[in-house]
Amino acid sequence: MAELKAVHQDAADAGHRSHVSVKAVWRELSSVVKIGIVNSNLITTFAGMWLAFYFTGEHFLENLHLVFFTLFGAALVIAGSCAINNYIDRDIDQYMERTKARPTVTGTMDPRRVLWLGIGLVAIGEMGLLMTTVTAAVVGLIGMATYVFLYTLWTKRHYTINTVVGSISGAVPPVIGWTAVDPEFHIVPLILFLIMFLWQPPHFLALAMKRCEEYRAAGIPMLPVVHGFAMTKRQIIVWVACLLPLPFYLFSLGVPFLIVATLLNVGWLLLGLAGLKMKDDIKWAKWMFVYSLNYLTILFVAMIIATLW
């Protein structure tokens, strides 16, 4: 009887260890591919695809295969690009609080395996996008190349303009979504690209202000590290102001959308201007960062809702 209990206990312990192991592996993989970035970019990818269905008159439910291959392909290309970024940045990630626990830094994952994982994910993702349109696959490849080569390998470590260069790749997902449905040129994906492109500098510069000393320790020439908070604030305000006219190019989504989008833009701009008088720069940067996250979510959800009226 005692032996039987021991067997059951051993089995239970083995099951528990297996469960813990699976959770640990998933946690490490999620960190390597930056699952949060993947998820947020899939929201904009879906929005671009949804708007393409709306403006071209195609039916969503009749094109579920496109939806699947677009989201599948985009997710893997983004995840793979992030994994390659983790491989490249493993030498500087150790100096930053938010990145020092990544598997490529702690050694819990072989960096070479992370690199090959990234390359494999990008390759499979590109094949997925090719199941939609060649244009979508090309756009995805441009986004990956910009993020890995122009941003991670080149500008991130050498120039304060790194944030702007990185914004190109971050603005690609909604264009992937659109071109997967309609590869022809249209003003809407261009506006979606510009919204995402202009949104990213104030978002990431606010983050850079919050993490200024970490970036300094890592030797990354972010704008607040090189030129200080005053110039960073002014640039953030300029980037936010550039967003103001863009919603009006989407006037066909209706007046309610224009009102929501304009209120979001004006609110962000007013918060930015308030920073010129605030003495607590870090507190202001936190407010700007949180606002930017809510801004993007509300704006793209509003776009989708506007098509349902």
Curated annotation (Swiss-Prot):
Name of protein: Protoheme IX farnesyltransferase
Subunit organization: Interacts with CtaA.
Record's function text: Converts heme B (protoheme IX) to heme O by substitution of the vinyl group on carbon 2 of heme B porphyrin ring with a hydroxyethyl farnesyl side group.
GO BP term, example: heme O biosynthetic process
Note: Carbon 2 of the heme B porphyrin ring is defined according to the Fischer nomenclature.
NCBIfam families associated with the record: cyoE_ctaB (TIGR01473)
Reaction(s) catalysed by this chain's protein: heme b + (2E,6E)-farnesyl diphosphate + H2O = Fe(II)-heme o + diphosphate
Secretion signal, residue range per the UniProt entry: none
Membrane topology reported for the UniProt record: Multi-pass membrane protein
Subcellular location field: Cell membrane
TM annotation in the entry: 35-55, 64-84, 114-134, 135-155, 161-181, 187-207, 231-251, 253-273, 289-309
Enzyme Commission (EC) number: 2.5.1.141
An annotated Gene Ontology molecular function: protoheme IX farnesyltransferase activity
Record keywords: Cell membrane, Heme biosynthesis, Membrane, Transferase, Transmembrane, Transmembrane helix
Keyword Thylakoid recorded: no
Family of the protein in this entry: Belongs to the UbiA prenyltransferase family. Protoheme IX farnesyltransferase subfamily.
Species of the source: Geobacillus kaustophilus (strain HTA426)
Annotated HAMAP family: CyoE_CtaB
Pathway(s) this gene product operates in, as recorded in its UniProt entry: Porphyrin-containing compound metabolism; heme O biosynthesis; heme O from protoheme: step 1/1
Cellular component terms per the entry's GO annotation: plasma membrane
